[in-house]
Regions:
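A compositional/structural signature for long, glycine/proline-rich flexible linkers
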Residues: 1-214
Length: 214
């Protein structure tokens, strides 16, 4: 990892992903050895939804959605209580997170240059539009072997992205066009669709059901 956030894509550039036409994604490939940590230092954005998600080389994801990110002392999380955006947070990606540890995500295991893991910062419906000019992306610091290195911002953000494909039953369950969709339950105002409705491989949003209910 030589620089931070080499890939950015949104409806204005790639016109992909779900469920918001006003989404912005920032992507970082991860190739990390044992003991490496990645620390994200960021600001809560003015947006409908935001999350930090990591994926293994096979596409299995873990997420910290907006409301679960604890603010730094003296800051407030606007998804937890009424507050202006701009509060500070710190999130750590590490290989040995304790169960229930706040602001921590698991480091993708088994990453190589040919099969990297992925770090994604998702922001839906940011005020003022998407892109780096409107969304304050977190600063990335790599900690390894007792030293810390803050990654400089990439000079461009159009690096090619080749998301992993979900294989086996997960891929077949999420693939569209192979049969009729199951009807929703009757006499219910709200129901939770199966995750396979949305997960068609690649870097699927772990928080899709939460976003739809928000």
């Amino acid at each position: 990892m030589s620089c931070a956030w080499p890939a950015e894509f949104s409806a204005q550039t790639d016109n992909i992903a779900f469920p918001d036409a006003a989404e912005t994604y920032f992507l970082q490939q991860i190739v990390a050895s044992a003991g490496t940590r990645i620390v994200l230092s960021g600001l809560f954005p003015d947006a409908r939804y935001a999350s930090i998600q990591v994926y293994t080389p096979s596409g299995v994801g873990a997420s910290l959605p907006d409301y679960r990110i604890a603010p730094q002392p003296g800051s407030l999380n606007p998804w937890r209580q009424q507050a202006a955006p701009g509060g500070r947070f710190t999130v750590t990606i590490r290989s040995d997170p304790a169960p229930g540890q706040a602001n921590t995500l698991p480091m993708p295991a088994g990453t190589t240059s040919q099969h990297p893991g992925y770090l994604m910062y998702r922001v839906y419906l940011p005020a003022g539009g998407g892109g780096l000019s409107a969304v304050p992306v977190p600063v990335l610091t790599v900690e390894q072997g007792g030293s810390a290195r803050t990654l400089p911002a990439c000079s461009s953000h159009n690096a090619p992205v080749h998301p992993p494909a979900v294989s086996g039953s997960a891929a077949s369950a999420g693939a569209g066009g192979s049969g009729a969709a199951a009807p929703p339950p009757r006499q219910l105002e709200f129901f939770k669709p199966p995750q396979s409705t949305f997960n068609n491989g690649g870097l699927a949003n772990v928080d899709t059901s939460y976003v739809l209910a928000y």
